[in-house]
Amino acid sequence: MAFRPSRLAIFIDGNNMFYAQQKNGWFFDPRRVLNYFANRPEIELVNAYWYTGLKDPQDQRGFRDALVSLGYTVRTKMLKEFHDESNGNRYFQRANLDIEIVIDMFNTVEQYDEIVLFSGDGDFERAIELLRAKQTHITVVSTDGMIARELRNATDRYIDLNDIRSFIEKTERPEPFVSAPVIAPA
């Protein structure tokens, strides 16, 4: 029987990860993320998606163009402003891209055997349960204090960003790819 690599799709909830990275005090490099998860002979990367909210159509243009040049499919939505009177009349902005992430997961489910989801949002719990029922292996990447318990419990494997920091952290100078260690399931 011929060897067939496991087909991988990566889904990055950019807004959720922005806050996780701020909490950690460091940022990951999108190129190094691809290398870490897909640069192994037993893995075939079939797609990588990045989802982010925008203040205006030109917001993050350079970053989005760089993501596309790395091979990411970039999905965007305009930020909406909300007023929270219960919190001292504070205004906040939000672009909820959860439904876009789930739609892409299910529209492409026949293309992959496993996914890596960068998010801590508990809204993904049911989608993850349904994908696991289809024999899809799910890894969720987030950080302690930013991941919903129900999401962490629904996944096959959880990786804390800080555990893979040395492999994915954004640095001032490009570094050669270093083979990633195998991280045992939590």
Swiss-Prot record:
InterPro entries: LabA, NYN. The keyword Hydrolase does not apply. Disruption phenotype: Cells grow slowly on solid but not liquid medium, excess KaiC expression no longer autorepresses, decreases the amplitude of circadian rhythms. Partially restores sasA deletion phenotypes suggesting they are not in the same output pathway, does not restore rpaA deletion, suggesting rpaA is downstream of labA in the same output pathway. In double labA-cikA deletions KaiC levels are much higher than either deletion alone, but the phosphorylation ratios are nearly wild-type. GO terms for biological process: circadian rhythm. Gene3D superfamilies: 5'-nuclease. The keyword Ribosomal protein does not apply. One of its GO terms (molecular function) is RNA nuclease activity. Induction: Transcripts rise slowly in low continuous light with little rhythmicity. It comes from the Bacteria. It holds the Pfam family NYN. Functions in an output pathway of the circadian clock. One of three clock output pathways. Involved in negative feedback regulation of KaiC; deletion leads to overexpression of KaiC protein and decreases the amplitude of the circadian response. Overexpression reduces the expression of circadian genes. This is Low amplitude and bright protein LabA.
